[in-house]
Amino acid sequence: MKMTFRWFGKEHDTVSLDHIRQIPGVEGIVGALYHIPVGEVWPLDDILELKRQVNEKGFHLEVIESVNVHEDIKLGLPSRDRYIENYKQTIRNLAKAGVKVICYNFMPIFDWTRSDLAKRRPDGSTVLAYEKQKIEQIDPEEMIRRIESGANGFLLPGWEPERLKTIKPLFSLYKGVTEEDLFDHLRYFLEQIVPVAEECGVRMALHPDDPPWSVFGLPRIATNKENLDRIVHMVNSPANGLTLCSGSLGANPANDVPDIFRHFLRMGRVPFAHVRNVEIHANGDFEETSHRSCDGSLNICEIMKALHEANFQGYIRPDHGRMIWGEQARPGYGLYDRALGIMYLLGIWDSLENEKKKQEGEKTCSRSIQV
C-alpha cells in the first residue's frame, strides 16, 4: 500500500509540499493540471514541471486526479471523438512522465455535490454536508453560487468556472438522457481509451458518483456494486479499473462498502482508493466526519482490513477532512485533519501487519521520506 496526499499545486493550495513531508508514511503526491481547460490536451512540459516540483521534495507523482471528461463525451455528441483523441494524447503524455494511475469520473455536469461546505460539528469543526431538502429547494444556478461563495476563494475540483457558466445549455442537452444512454456513452469512451492505457502501462480508475444517486434529475451510474461491476466488464482489462471511495459509496446505507472493496480487490480492479468516513442521518442526509470508525457510519477498520487481506499494492489517500484548529483552507482539503486521517489509516494498517508478522519478528512500518 502506497500512502499519498492530494495537492493542488503552488498556485492553488494553502498546504505546502514541505508540510506534507512532515506527515509520516506519505510516499507520493496526487496532482493535476488545473489551468488546462477540460477536453484539451495536457502538455508534456507542464506535466514534467509538476513532476519536478513533486520529486524535488522526495515524493513520486504516479497518480493523477483528475483528468476530467468533456461533457460532449458524456452526452455522446458527434464532437466527442475530438475530445477522446485529446484524452488519449493526455494519457500518453502522462505515461511519459511516469504516471501509473489516472482517476476520473463520469458524472454529468456536476462533480461531487454538497448543500453545505462548512457545517459545524458538535466539536466545533466544520465539514462538508448534504441535506436533500436544501438541494431539492434550490435550482442548479443557485447551488453553484452557494458553492462558490463557500469555497473561501479557492478553486474546487470538479467545479471549474468555464464549464459551469454554461449550466443552462448543458441541462437542456441532458434532457431525455437516461442511465442506459450514459452507460452507452461510457462504454464508447472506454472502448477508445482503455487500449491506449494498456499500451502505455497506465490504469484508468473511475471514481464513484458522489453522492451515489441522481441530483437535479441528472442520470448517475457509478453508484453501487452492480453498476460498477457492469462498468469494469464493459472492457475487460486490468487497465479499466476503479478508484474505490468509501465516503462516496458509503453515503448510501444500502451499499455494503467493505463487501464492495473485497469484490473488486479480488478482481484486481482497484489501483487507487480514497478512504474517509461519513455520518448518515435517519432521513438520508449525511455529513463528513473524522476518519475514525466510531465517529461516522462506516467501519473504516473493516475497509482497511479488506485492503490488507488483498495484499493491496496500489495507492491510497485520506479524503475530505474537517476544518480544525482554526485552519483556513479549501473546504475538505486542509492539512491537519487529513494528516490525522493518514495516521489513523496507517495505524490500522500497522496493527494488521503486526498481527500477521508477530511470529516473524519483522518491523511493520516503512521509513519516512529522506531527502
Swiss-Prot record:
Domain of life per record: Bacteria
Query: Could you tell me which PANTHER family the record lists for this protein?
Result: MANNONATE DEHYDRATASE
Keywords on this record?
A: Iron, Lyase, Manganese
* Co-factor requirement: Fe(2+); Mn(2+)
In Swiss-Prot or TrEMBL terms, this protein is called Mannonate dehydratase
GO term, biological process aspect, one: D-glucuronate catabolic process
**Catalyzed reactions:** D-mannonate = 2-dehydro-3-deoxy-D-gluconate + H2O
Q: What is its EC number?
A: 4.2.1.8
Q: Which family does it belong to?
A: Belongs to the mannonate dehydratase family.
Q: Which GO terms describe its molecular function?
A: ferrous iron binding; manganese ion binding; mannonate dehydratase activity
Look at the named UniProt entry and state the broad enzyme category this protein falls under. lyase
- Originating gene: uxuA
> What does this gene product do?
Catalyzes the dehydration of D-mannonate.
* KW ATP-binding (keyword) present: no
The pathway to which it is assigned is: Carbohydrate metabolism; pentose and glucuronate interconversion
Q: Does the keyword Ion transport apply?
A: no
